[in-house]
Amino acid sequence: MVSIRKSLISEGSDRKKVIIVGLGAMGSGIARLLLEKGHLVEVVGAVAARSDKHGKDLGDVLELSEKTGIAVSSLDEALSKDADVVIQATTSFVKEAFTDILKMVGSGKNVISIAEEMSYPHITAPDLSLDMDRAAKKNDVTILGTGVNPGFILDTLVLTLTGSFEEVLSIHASRINDLSPFGRLVMKTQGVGTSPDEFRKGIEEGTITGHIGFLQSVNMIADALGWELDEIIETREPILSAVSRKTPHVEVGPGMVAGCNHIVRGIKNGTALITLEHPQQIHPHLEGIETGDFIRIEGSSSSVNMAIKPEVPGGIGTIAMAVNMIPFVVDAPAGLATMLDMPFPRAFM
């Protein structure tokens, strides 16, 4: 068995070589963290979708004070380089991630994707998942989807807490966060700034989606605990504001939508065994709402109530999870993996 400890403390010539694909908000954050961990990893390539960034130094694209000597390029050019891992930060969906992932594994590289659906990809894309698994095994590499949510807070962390139970009867977990730092696209997909009627129309038309990843998390939990659910029920309701709220991208008056309360329930014999909630809104403090991550597990002889206040930061958390899983993905058996197949996550320092 390969020593995980050895991978965690690797130095010098044993540094993991990494290519980052996608230089948006998350990809740029991952690139910065990789550069900060130069004693553990070496960034050998960076890929941007926009061709006007190609040929530029990564340090300039990231607006760093120094150049890195790494030229931003196309995916094909980056994959021609020797690397241990490619981190993909370009999309939320398996169908959009699939083609590039096949190119990555075809070049003999392990892949970490932060696409939310990739955390448990067979739920929405069973055929593509089978293709990815076959390609990874053929090329003796591993594919993993991860992030802070899905990937950690509302699935991996929940399951870790069940380890102290004789028997689990029910799980209720919620993540309450502030949307204010996010941009226009997130405001649109969460329905912020709409009227109640506009919100409901957006739900019907699919322009207001709420949280991407709930189906992955609830199925991951159920599979890990051996629960065969009868049905999974999702609801998305508008969070109406009683006060005026404002961000650089949207203004919300009283009676308008300040966010989306997205809930998913895993049902067995008419009972909700798993309930996951993700109410997201701008400036929740204006109505006295505390942000945080909350997990309640009921067992046959004990219960656990865990609260993290404020919530684990979504951006920083996802960036960290992508980087922290590098040594585990490098050491993992070939194939398409999930967080259920990995050692418990920890800081890669």
Tell me the role of every PLM-derived stretch.
Residues 21, 162-287, 291-293, 307, ...:
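Active-site-lining helix/loop region of Rossmann-like oxidoreductase modules
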Residues 282-349:
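C-terminal helical cap and adjacent loop that interface with cofactors, partners, or active-site loops
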Residues 2-62:
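N-terminal Rossmann-like dinucleotide-binding module
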Residues 91, 109, 115-119, 148-149, ...:
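Short, ordered loop/turn segments at secondary-structure junctions
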Residues 50-81:
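Conserved N-terminal Rossmann-fold NAD(P) cofactor-binding segment
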Residues 79-85, 94-116:
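Rossmann-fold NAD(P) dinucleotide-binding segment
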Residues 90-91, 277:
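Short glycine-/small-residue-rich Rossmann-like dinucleotide-binding loops
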Residues 116-140:
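Rossmann-fold NAD(P)-binding glycine/threonine-rich loop
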